[in-house]
Amino acid sequence: MTQVAKKILVTCALPYANGSIHLGHMLEHIQADIWVRYQRMRGHQIYFICADDAHGTPIMLKAQQLGIAPEEMINEMNLEHQTDFAGFGISYDNYHSTHSEENQQLSTLIYQRLKENGFIKSRTISQLFDPEKVMFLPDRFVKGSCPKCHSPDQYGDNCEVCGATYNPTDLINPKSAVSGTTPVMRESEHFFFDLPAFSEMMRAWTRSGALQEQVANKMQEWFESGLQEWDISRDAPYFGFEVPDAPGKYFYVWLDAPIGYMSAFQNLCQKRSDLRFDEFWDVDSKADLYHFIGKDIVYFHSLFWPAMLEGSHFRKPTNLFVHGYVTVNGAKMSKSRGTFIKASTYLAHLDAECLRYYYAAKLSSRIDDIDLNLEDFIQRVNADIVNKVVNLASRNAGFINKRFDGQLAATVADPALYATFVNAATSIGDAFSSRETSRAIREIMALADLANRYVDEQAPWVVAKQEGREADLQAICSMGIQLFRVLMTYLKPVLPSLAERAKAFLATPLDWDDLSAPLLSHRIRPFKALFSRIEAAQVDAVIEVSRLEAAAAGEPAAAPAGALAEAPIAPTINFDDFAKVDMRVALIKRAESVKGSDKLLKLTLDLGGTSRQVFSGIRAAYPDPQVLEGRLTIMVANLAPRKMRFGISEGMVMAAGPGGKDIFLLSPDAGALPGMPVK
């Protein structure tokens, strides 16, 4: 390889140890695994770690409900999580737990360094207390209306609607999530991390250009609203680590959870003689450190975590790689509808690599939500993996094995076509490296189309019947096998198990840097089925089992779908009428509330060379308009401008839903560009 080998440490967010892994979790772990596998293929020294987040009140309470010790519950869950990740081919070098000796030592060390450096303060606070359960209530065990946007049923630390952060005591009409009673105020001494002391450092880190633009924009918003001291302690009863020299006080789970990245790596270092902890975590480390996380935990990873590391003299992350949520069939995952799918349920019915491929085909470096459309899932996997890639090997291997004893031709039949495939390595590699996996998949499938077109045009099944054309037949089919090898090498980070089967069939490793040398006069092995089609019945079984599991757990039955009943299909129009509507992909460059209107947002849209101003009545659904900035949507571009009291509206954005808070802005798949027509 020509590039300089790097030392890289990669982590995924730590799954919480009180529940099973589901397909929402798997998006992140698959995204990270694809990136890690590509980096390994290019010769980088990369270590991939994770752990269970094993502390906190939820774990303590669930263990009580089960009648077992928290340690027993988290050990069982850790084994289940590791089994699920292994089933999806997630190639962790180490999977640990935050309830470990290493994590306690590191948490204590970091706390003591922060305290010695003057970044830990203590003061008496008024805290919500559940008089029925005789316990102070953590943030996530108090619910009420958000003090900023007044959205109901929000947790005590942050609002999932507007993104605001606050204290539990700020909630409107708070209730205990443990007992349902109204909590009372009690005083307690707590310890605080002086986050505001790191404001300038954090601003500089944000401006460095390393972070995703959407993350940097959100951090700037937090800076403008002012950083607050962070409560890092909790009162007994609590399952976690005790604060040194403070009996009855425990580290808040979000203090020791990210330290779990460090302790999981330290645990790996103890197992291997060739690794040094300081080489990756020392403040002057030259290694790269990347955290793959979901957008729901950006606040903790972009503010608290870097500041904690800075204040305790450890290195900060090189970057955060943030992704969006997973929806199923265009809606939030639902247990009652069977679309809240556990990893183990999926694996019992479907090949893990089908989901790996589908997620890869949709993922990008942006923080966009990914929709698992089950019909599209079946169609895309069957069309791409089975029909385009595997079928390329199948339709050529038979002739090579039967007519030429498995031996490929001594020359390449179409050197220009082979060069096209090999030269694509740079662009495809750049796409993998920059986490633009959807682009990588598009480029790989475009090559697969070229390969199949070549075979169709050369028609080896016809050549095989013509006397005296044995050499032509061998050359054509060998070319098909050569192109299959290149495709499978490119797909290896996404489909590692299929790549292993392809490697056995081809009798040669699939190495990125070896592609320029074709397999000449090489003997392949007899072809065996490499991949199976997805049948609709398999997907139906996953949904039904998931629905039954939810029912057994006491989840409410799904309400009948009523969208059509509430909004009947409009009268039929002819095609000419529809063709008059010019819909385009648009990038939301800016989103603002409209002073004097409680319904409208002002959107500045980029159509790829021109800007439009649109007023849209979606404010109730998006009370924090900045969450829309940087998002792609669909707009009607040729709608006549409309003069409104607040200005000129130059089009209309497309959304679904009955109105009010139930409005869902439409977004195209990753890969669409501003200005593209929607057909």
Curated annotation (Swiss-Prot):
SUPFAM superfamilies listed in its UniProt record: Anticodon-binding domain of a subclass of class I aminoacyl-tRNA synthetases, Methionyl-tRNA synthetase (MetRS), Zn-domain, Nucleic acid-binding proteins, Nucleotidylyl transferase
Signal peptide: none
Keyword flag Cytoplasm: yes
Binding site for ATP: 335
'HIGH' region (motif): residue ranges: 15-25
Domain of life the protein comes from: Bacteria
Pfam family, one: Anticodon_3
Catalytic activity: tRNA(Met) + L-methionine + ATP = L-methionyl-tRNA(Met) + AMP + diphosphate
Short motif 'KMSKS' region, span: 332-336
A cellular-component GO term for this protein: cytosol
Co-factor binding comment: Binds 1 zinc ion per subunit.
Keyword Metal-binding: yes
Keywords: Aminoacyl-tRNA synthetase, ATP-binding, Cytoplasm, Ligase, Metal-binding, Nucleotide-binding, Protein biosynthesis, RNA-binding, tRNA-binding, Zinc
Binding site for Zn(2+): 146, 149, 159, 162
Annotated NCBIfam families: metG (TIGR00398), metG_C_term (TIGR00399), PRK00133.1 (NF001100)
Function recorded in the entry: Is required not only for elongation of protein synthesis but also for the initiation of all mRNA translation through initiator tRNA(fMet) aminoacylation.
Assembly and interaction partners: Homodimer.
Protein name (database record): Methionine--tRNA ligase
Organism encoding this protein: Sodalis glossinidius (strain morsitans)
